[in-house]
Regions:
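Residues at alpha-helix termini
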Residues: 85, 113, 198, 214-215, ...
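C-terminal alpha-helical cap/extension of soluble enzyme domains
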Residues: 2-8, 14, 19-27, 49-52, ...
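Active-site beta->alpha loop and helix N-cap motifs at the rims of alpha/beta catalytic domains
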Residues: 2-160, 177, 331-335
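Hydrophobic transmembrane alpha-helix bundles
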Residues: 53-54, 91-102, 124-137, 157-166, ...
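Conserved active-site and cofactor/substrate-binding residues in soluble primary-metabolism enzymes
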Residues: 34-37, 41, 70, 74, ...
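Catalytic alpha/beta core domains of metabolic enzymes, predominantly
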Residues: 140-144, 155-273
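Long, contiguous hydrophobic alpha-helical segments, chiefly transmembrane helices and signal peptides
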Residues: 20-21, 46, 56, 61-64, ...
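Short, solvent-exposed alpha-helical surface patches in well-structured domains
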Residues: 41, 74, 168, 253-256, ...
Length: 335
């Protein structure tokens, strides 16, 4: 775990590789319980079978907005326990977004005690008074904790920080060392790097890596929170092989590989159901049921209640058919 003072030096080398954002497997009536055995298997699969170097816990893909404080704490504890039993060096990233700063503080303090390496705070989701309000929120947490902090600049919050607002947070709070820029605005990430060059940036628009931004130092070598375990199996490591080429600056080979392997087409086929609900097409969602159905197609356990908790809806049959067909075309399943 990095403390606040050393966070930026630590982040430059520690935040590297594929960081898997874990889903939450539900069970019981209406998904009121968590299938802890299934969750443990998922962690072991990501860290052990796939050998990925980072985890991203209790964020949007995990449906944090539907979880109790107690559930979120336990999900982190189990992830730390299972991951470190396999690889003591695995980086555990805990997302502590909450409506109230006091709840975020409770989760951040718990993450610090439970062995998380870094905490990410998503841009506050309600009644946010712009960049100044976000800065106040971060300060409230930073003044009361001693752990590396990251920003999660997600459009699902309803407000996206500008590069200037994010850079001001970095300037004011020494613990802030990384950001997941989830709004697919590469021009803002480029400007943010100019304003705060010490910040490790993951730009979710992965085309910037093909443009040489990693070698230029604009973005970092870590996929801070993705679902890499849904894009490969231990037998077909297309996702890891592609990113290994990128990280080694073999960009032409990487692009050729993504095309020839079917990875590019697979990502296009899958992404629509992961992040878009047809009944609200202008909203960037994390459709838990879609991620979990994809996991089930690969044979991963998703609990006896494989849907999202409210207020999300059940995944339609069309989505299931298209997701399964995408996996078949990509060659990760036979049928």
């Amino acid at each position: 775990m990095a403390n606040a003072r050393d966070a930026r030096q630590w982040a430059r080398t520690a935040l590297h590789g594929i960081g898997n954002s874990l889903y939450t497997p539900f069970c019981g009536q209406d998904g009121d319980d968590i299938d802890w055995d299934a969750y443990r298997i998922l962690v072991r699969h990501c860290v052990g079978a796939l050998g990925h170097s980072m985890l991203w816990v209790t964020s949007g893909l995990a449906e944090f907005w539907s979880l109790t404080i107690g559930e979120r704490k336990r999900l982190l504890e189990v992830a730390v326990e299972e991951a470190r039993a396999i690889n003591k060096e695995v980086v555990v990233q805990s997302c502590t977004a909450a409506l109230s700063a006091k709840e975020c503080l409770e989760l951040t303090r718990h993450a610090q005690q439970a062995g998380a390496d870094i905490v990410y705070i998503q841009t506050p989701m309600m009644e946010l008074h712009g960049g100044e309000g976000a800065l106040n929120y971060f300060k409230y947490i930073a003044d009361r904790t001693d752990i590396a902090l990251g920003m999660f600049n997600s459009p699902s919050s309803g407000y996206v920080l500008s590069a200037y607002e994010a850079a001001h947070i970095v300037e004011e709070i020494v613990a802030v060392c990384a950001t997941k820029e989830g709004s697919f605005r590469p021009h803002q990430s480029r400007l943010l790097h100019e304003l705060a060059p010490e910040l490790v940036i993951w730009e979710c628009d992965s085309t910037v890596y093909r443009a040489g931004w990693l070698k230029a130092g604009i973005v970092g070598p870590g996929q801070l929170g993705t679902a890499g375990y849904l894009f490969e199996t231990p037998q077909k490591r297309a996702f890891s092989e592609y990113w290994d080429l990128v990280w080694n600056d073999k960009l032409v080979e990487a692009m050729d590989y993504a095309q020839a392997s079917g990875l590019d087409q697979f990502e296009l086929d899958m992404r629509g159901w992961f992040t878009r609900y047809p009944g609200r097409p202008d909203y960037f969602t994390h459709w838990g049921g879609a991620y979990k159905y994809a996991a089930s197609v690969l044979g991963l356990p998703v609990g006896s209640y494989p849907e999202s908790r409210p207020p999300q809806v059940k995944l339609p049959d069309q989505a299931r058919q298209e997701i399964r067909e995408a996996y078949r075309k990509f060659g990760l399943i036979d049928d």
